[in-house]
Structure formats: C-alpha cells, structure tokens
C-alpha cells in the first residue's frame, strides 16, 4: 500500500498543449536554431503544435499552422501555453504581432530592435490594454492617436508576457527597471529569468595545430563590429595568417571595402550566408574566433558559444553582451582609444605562445550552460510551473478579448449597414460570416 501511494505521488507531470510561435525559415535565426535542438526533446514530454508564417502542414516533424489559424486551433482544442521566441528581423515580425493577441511565455533573444515593426505593433495602446486587463470596465483606447516609439525596444512584448525569459544576461539586466506595469495573475507573480541558448558542437573537428594561424569571425562590417580595429591588428602580425569572415549577402560590399582599405585581400575569405551550420564548418579549420561587438543590438549567440564549446580561443568586447562572458573563458577587449593596442597584444600572444590550447574552462562552461537536454528540461519545468498561472490569465484575457470584439463589431456594423450610401448591407452580406469564423459573435 505504501509503495503504491509513493508511486502515485511521484507521477510524471501531465503533458501540456503548447502553441510554439517561432520563425522556422531563417537559417541564420536564433529562434530557428533553438527550435531544431529543443523540439525533438520537448515533443517527448508535451503536445506541441508549431505556428509560423509557413503554410506547410508539418515542420521539424511536428504539426505546423500558419499563425493566423492560432485562434481557431485554440478554440477547437485549447492550448495550456502560448510560447513565443522573440528576435529582431522581418522573419520573426509575426511573433511580435501575435503575442499582443494572446499572452504567453516569451523567450526574448533581442530586447533592442532594428525597426518599429508592423503598424499593429508600434502603434499599439498596450499600456492602456494592461490597465483594462485589471479593470475591464475601462473604455477602449482611441485608435486615432499615434503612439510611435523613438527607438524600437521590446517593452510592449515583455509587458504583455506574464513569464519572460532572456537568452542574454544583458537583456535581463536592462529590462529590470524599464517596465512599471505588466500582465500578472496576481501582484508580484511576473517571472523574468535567464535561459541560455542551446548549442551542439557535433561535427566541429579540431583544426590542424601546426597550420598557419587561422581566424574566424561573424562580426558585422559596420562600426559596431570593430573590423576597422581588428583588421589592421591582423595585418601587423609578422607570420602568415588567414581570416574567414562569415557575413550576410547584404554586407558583402561593406566588407570588401574594408579588406581593400587595409590591404588584406589575399588573407581574408568572405563566406556568404550567416548561419550556425556554416559557422560550425568554418570553426573546423579555425584556431581563434573574433567576436568583437560593441552594440546593444544583436546577439553573440549561438556563434560565440559554438566557438567556446568547440575549444576555440575567443576574443570579445567587454561591453553590452560581452560583459557576461567570464574573463577565464575569453580574451576581453575594452572599446576605445586603447582598443587597437589591446587587440594587437592578444594576437601577438596567441601567435608566439601555446595559448590556443588554454580553452578548457570555456568548454566546461558551455557544456554545462548550453546543453540542449538541460535547456529543454528547464523550459519544460517552466511550462509546468506556469500552467496554473497562465490558466488564470487566459480566462481574464478572454473576457477582455470578447469585450473588444463586441465593441469592434458594433462600430463596424454601424459603419457598414445598409443605408442610402450602401446598396447592400456590408456587415450582413460580407463581414458577419468572416467574424464568425474568427470566433467573434455579434
């Protein structure tokens, strides 16, 4: 009897229905890379359906729907958790839009964004919507008011996410004091924490130790990528060296201008199409990875972690995302007037000594922090712990959602019903059926 009771108390957590919103098409995207590593593990524990911009019925071996079908799928068989991966770029813009329609758990890869996004995103009265979440009797915000942000940040997306995960310690630190109000099941229940990006170093082989010193970088050719600092430092090395520079096609012209300016055309090879897979191939023939980036935009992962995890020496800027990297795991450079001199000294030290073998601390760090099985276990635990809170929030949000439908339907009906100006009743003949398909009732 006692054994039976103990077995019952240790029963496995129930399988949850997860709506997984993520860009799955961008080969160089963080969301796509994380999904490929985590979904095969998480799908063994939970019922996961993908929502993307693709119309394919299956992606990564799981059911896939176009994201505009999410509401109807949820109505037919409700999801326990809506999960979003938020990153910069046009390919993931739909995620920014939809998480304002249905709150959930958001994994923020990029807190600072390069564009304002769609009209529904940057002109959203999200702060007023949060007030309505707690007081459904408030009137809806006027749509005629422009609410443009001076600089695109994911404040709206974080505030509308009861549980927010950050793949960068820098992003988590920056957001802690920036948002005063957010959606919560109860005061103080909002959860924000760091969740590392998973990586796989499988297939990355060790480079020849006796070959000429070989460098690799994914730095962008703009000022923030610091190429105008590290290219002349490389040129100053006395012995032979090679650099493989992985860039996006749109960056090719700027990169070519730089390598001509510093007369290193013969030593630099440009590879087009930045992606973790191509980076892994490049690392197999590289000794040192250059990750000098001095900007809040973008992310060092998974490229830096792949370099460290595969035993490469790495050089990072000691600002923004580079601050979180321990000095025992990478050479850290301070941007500024002494930056070139620091980079040159590091290159010379690597060239003259056996420093390229001193990578064990970094490998241990990555093996522990970025293991896909560990990340999947952490994420599954977050899903389980958050499910009761999300059920409360969903119920309250649904009431607000229906109120918005009623208000919009009344406005549309008034504007489109038959009159001397309309030969047909537009609402009755054209719109009512569409609204019913969306789950809206008049």
Give the predicted meaning of each segment:
Residues 360-442:
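C-terminal amphipathic helix plus adjacent low-complexity
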Residues 283-298, 312:
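Acidic donor-binding loop of glycosyltransferase active sites
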Residues 255-274:
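Nucleotide-activated donor-binding/catalytic signature segment of Leloir-type glycosyltransferases, i.e.
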Residues 19, 165, 207-225, 244:
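Conserved donor-binding/catalytic core segment of Leloir-type glycosyltransferases
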Residues 147-191:
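A short, active-site helix/loop in glycosyltransferases that binds the activated sugar's phosphate group
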Residues 32, 222-236:
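A conserved mid-protein helix/loop that constitutes part of the nucleotide-sugar donor-binding site
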Residues 55, 242-255:
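Glycosyltransferase donor-sugar binding loop
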């Amino acid at each position: 009897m006692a054994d039976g009771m103990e077995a019952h108390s240790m029963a496995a957590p129930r399988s949850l229905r997860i709506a997984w919103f993520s860009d799955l098409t961008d080969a160089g995207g963080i969301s796509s890379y994380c999904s490929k590593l985590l979904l095969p593990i998480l799908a063994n524990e939970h019922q996961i359906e993908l929502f993307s911009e693709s119309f394919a019925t299956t992606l990564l071996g799981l059911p896939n729907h176009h994201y505009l079908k999410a509401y109807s799928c949820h109505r037919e068989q409700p999801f326990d958790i809506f999960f979003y991966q938020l990153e910069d770029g046009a390919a993931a813009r739909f995620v920014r839009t939809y998480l304002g329609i249905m709150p959930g758990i958001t994994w923020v890869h990029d807190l600072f964004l390069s564009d304002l996004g769609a009209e529904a995103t940057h002109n959203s009265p999200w702060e007023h919507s949060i007030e309505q979440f707690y007081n459904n009797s408030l009137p809806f915000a006027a749509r005629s008011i422009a609410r443009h942000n001076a600089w695109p940040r994911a404040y709206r997306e974080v505030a509308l996410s009861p549980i927010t995960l950050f793949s960068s310690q820098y992003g988590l630190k920056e957001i802690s004091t920036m948002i005063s109000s957010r959606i919560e099941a109860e005061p103080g229940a909002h959860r924000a924490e760091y969740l590392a990006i998973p990586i796989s170093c499988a297939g990355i082989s060790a480079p020849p130790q006796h070959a000429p010193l070989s460098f690799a970088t994914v730095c962008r050719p703009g000022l923030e990528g610091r190429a105008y600092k590290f290219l002349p430092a490389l040129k100053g090395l006395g012995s032979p060296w090679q650099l493989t520079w992985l860039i996006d096609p749109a960056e090719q012209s700027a990169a070519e201008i730089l390598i001509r300016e510093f007369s290193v055309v013969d030593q630099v090879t440009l590879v087009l199409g930045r992606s973790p897979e191509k980076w892994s191939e490049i690392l197999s023939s590289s000794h040192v990875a250059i990750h000098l980036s001095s900007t809040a935009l973008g992310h060092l992962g998974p490229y830096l972690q792949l370099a460290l995890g595969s035993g490469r020496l790495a050089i990072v800027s000691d600002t923004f995302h580079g601050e979180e990297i321990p000095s025992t795991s990478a050479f850290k450079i301070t941007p500024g007037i002494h930056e070139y001199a620091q980079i040159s000294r590091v290159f010379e030290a690597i060239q003259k000594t056996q420093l390229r073998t001193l990578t064990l601390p970094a490998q241990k760090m990555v093996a522990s922090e970025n293991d896909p099985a560990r990340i999947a276990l952490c994420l599954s635990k977050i899903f389980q712990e958050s499910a009761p809170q999300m059920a409360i929030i969903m119920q309250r949000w649904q009431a607000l959602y229906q109120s918005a439908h009623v208000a919009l339907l009344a406005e549309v009906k008034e504007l489109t019903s038959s009159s001397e100006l309309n030969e047909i009743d537009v609402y009755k003949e054209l719109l009512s059926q569409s609204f019913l398909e969306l789950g809206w009732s008049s």
